[in-house]
Every structure is written in C-alpha cells, then in structure tokens.
Amino acid sequence: MFKHAVLALAMVASGLPVLARAEILGAGSTAAAPVYRIWSAGYTAASGTTLKYDAVGSGEGLKRIRAGTVDFGASDVPLSSADAAKAGLVCVPSVVTGAVPFVNLPGMPHGQLRLTGEVLARIFLGKVETWDAPELHALNPGLALPRLKIHPVVRADGSGTTYHFTDYLSAVSADWKAAYGTKSTLAWPADFTAAKGSGDVVKAVQATPGAIGYVDYNYVLDNDLNAVQLRNAAGHFVSAQVSGFRDAVLQSAWNRKGDFTAPLVNLPGPDTWPITMGTFIIVPAVSANGARTLDALKFLTWGYFHGDELAAHAKFVPLPERVQAIAYRELARVTDTAGTTIGLQSMPANWAK
C-alpha cells in the first residue's frame, strides 16, 4: 500500500499530466536492455508513454546523458558520489544480474567445465594457452579436454560487464590486479578477438572453436551458451542462476547498509555467484528540460513499484526495498534549472530507516 501511495505522489507531484510525452529516450547498458524493454511494455500499457532504448554499452550511455541527447543513461558501472557530483548527475540502481564466462568447446557438455578465478585470470592474461593445460585437467578430471588453442573474446567498447568481470579477476588474482585492475575498457593483447557489444561477443565465440568470452546472464539463456562453473568464495563450484545473484545481494553492503556503490563480486555464501553485478540509471541532477527528466523518473519509479515480477521474469533480481529507499532519496534531489524539485519531492526521506 505504501509503495502505491508514494508512486501516485511521484506521478503528480510536478503538476504535469501523466501523458505529457509520447516517448522516453534511454541508452547504454547492453546487459540491462532486456529488463528496460520488458518494463517498457508494462509502462506503456499503464501510461501510454513509450521507451526507445539503444543498447550501445555503458560507456556510450554515460556519454549520451552527459551530452543531454537522452532522457536517461544506463550503466553497469556505478558512479561514486564524488564523480556523480562533479559531473552533475544522479546515479541509482535498477536491478541486479551476473556476468558469466562461456566457451565454445565442440563436444563439451553444457555447464560442466569448471574454472577457478585464478585460472580464469591466467587465461585472460594469456598465460594458459590450450584447453588441455595441466591446471585445466586438475579442475576437470572427468572431462575430455580438447587439444585446442584458447581464443579469448573480449569487449572492444566501454563495457560495464567488462568492469565487473575485471573487478572479480582483481579480487581473486594478484597478477591480474597488478597487470590491469578494474576497468571498463582495457588495452587487450593484440591476438585477442575484440568485439563491440555483448551480441558480437556471442557471435565471435560461436564462430570460433576454442573460444572463451563473457556476457551477462540473459545472453547465456537467450543463446543457449555453454556457461562455465566458477568456484565461489566459499570454495563451491556453482553455475550462474538468479538465486546465486540474489544470495550475493543479501550478503552485500547493498542489503546491510543500502550502499549500492559496494561491489557484488566474490562475496561469501555457499551458493553465491561470484560475478554478480548491479545495473544503474543515470539522470541529470539539474535538468535543463524538466518534463523530459520527469518522464524518465516516472518510468524508473514505475519499475520499482510494479516491475519486480517483470524483472524476475526477465531473469534479473529486483532491488531490496532498503536499496530502493536510498535510491528514492537520491532521485528526490533532482531539480530543474530554477531549483524546483521535479517529480519525487513528496517521497518521505525517512522511509529507509
């Protein structure tokens, strides 16, 4: 009941009609595209307003919201409070998913290959070069590993999926941390295949026997990819699934403190997926076009209040209510150039307490 009352307040607080515009423009994360599109279908049915979303990658989404060419940017990389303030932006989470390594090994049963974070790092450092290497045999004694060269496929563009993938590798491998660290864009070795966007990563791996790449969970499901098992912080080999992403959120500072800038990788728990990742919506803190920004806020608010089941259907994890409450407080700071709060000023600031 409380959620629905707050939603109604948010919709009317600005005094603008719900159907003020016919279309919202968003761009960014390829990982989050499925949930924004499924939310859009529900939101259009409820409001008449549509969403045009371009899945162009997190880096490009951030560029477009900074340039003011979209109503919201979408990124899998959270902006720190300092970076958001410096850029004049507000960044809040929408849902949670996971990054998943996958392979093209002819004859290999789906979901059976086991890797540790350390070995995965060595593969992407170019230090493990064939699939029959001793460290891979040690992890997979019951599998017939082929004598194939390993062909890493990586992202060429600025990618939130790359950010979380490398954040995980930095957490489990000192060698990786020293060589690359956590980044959205890397100077990959010249003999790696670099693809723009998750869809092209999938195509490149599928076209190359011996290839390994990484994408978010929805691409694994939609393309029936051969995802690997990873050893998590508890020492258990686990497969990527929604319950493992949810366990990571419950173990994290997101749930304990409402801190959605905290990492979700390599967290404790017997079933936790070790490369869990949030995805975020970014809007201007001071909007030159209040009506357009208000429409973006209405869409996100609708997703928070009505989109949990739709997010789960799309294989994403909805946010804990405590995290949503912190997000509302952030959104309530958005104003127009006259200093007037747009849209969400009626939300109680103490809801999270």
Each model region followed by its residue ranges:
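A cross-taxonomic marker for long C-terminal extensions/tails that follow the last structured domain
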Residues: 7, 14, 350-353
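Flexible loop/hinge segments at secondary-structure junctions
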Residues: 21-353
